[in-house]
């Protein structure tokens, strides 16, 4: 089965530094067709193991090799494909005035708790839609500092229970998964 692994909060402003090439080498010892995309912790791999086993193994590798304890989120290729099949219409419009993201909620956390922590969105500045324990979140580029969620995603206690990727990043990850399937 093909999995997408999202590492939360790595290689940002020199913190939680993980060299993706080194991590890839470690992962290749245990998993097949390992691929990384960007330096922000996007990994594609194949395994017959469960999400739980993969999560535990990757957490161990990261702790042993890089001496870090970071949250990770794992989803299957089919789950990511389903997310894109249910993307909101406002994102499909590709409005250049908005920055489009997907917030992945790391289990056991859930949407209701995340929403309660982040609070109500700033109308006319941001838009959200929940789908299957992810949140599509877009905000106006000109007014992003006025966005309630933009301020709170990095500063509230919920920050370790979510990982955020741009729609474009995840679209490319999905494409890489598809390309790798044809090889």
What are the language-model segments listed below?
Residues 3-40, 44-183:
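Surface-exposed, charge/polar-rich loops and edge strands
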């Amino acid at each position: 089965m093909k999995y997408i692994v999202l590492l939360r909060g790595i290689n940002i402003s020199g913190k939680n530094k993980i060299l993706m090439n080194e991590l890839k080498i470690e992962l290749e010892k245990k998993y097949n067709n390992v691929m990384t995309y960007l330096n922000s912790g996007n990994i594609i791999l194949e395994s017959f193991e469960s999400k739980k086993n993969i999560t535990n193994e990757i957490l161990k590798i990261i702790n042993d090799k890089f001496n870090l304890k970071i949250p990770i989120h794992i989803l299957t290729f089919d789950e990511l494909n389903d997310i894109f099949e249910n993307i909101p219409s406002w994102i499909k419009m590709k409005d250049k005035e908005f920055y489009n993201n997907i917030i992945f909620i790391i289990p056991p956390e859930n949407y209701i708790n995340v929403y309660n922590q982040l609070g109500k969105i700033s109308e006319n500045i941001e838009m959200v839609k929940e789908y299957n324990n992810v949140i599509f979140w877009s905000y106006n580029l000109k007014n992003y500092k006025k966005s309630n969620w933009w301020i709170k995603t990095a500063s509230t206690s919920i920050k370790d229970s979510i990982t955020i990727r741009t729609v474009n990043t995840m679209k490319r990850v999905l494409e890489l998964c598809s390309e790798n399937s044809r090889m």
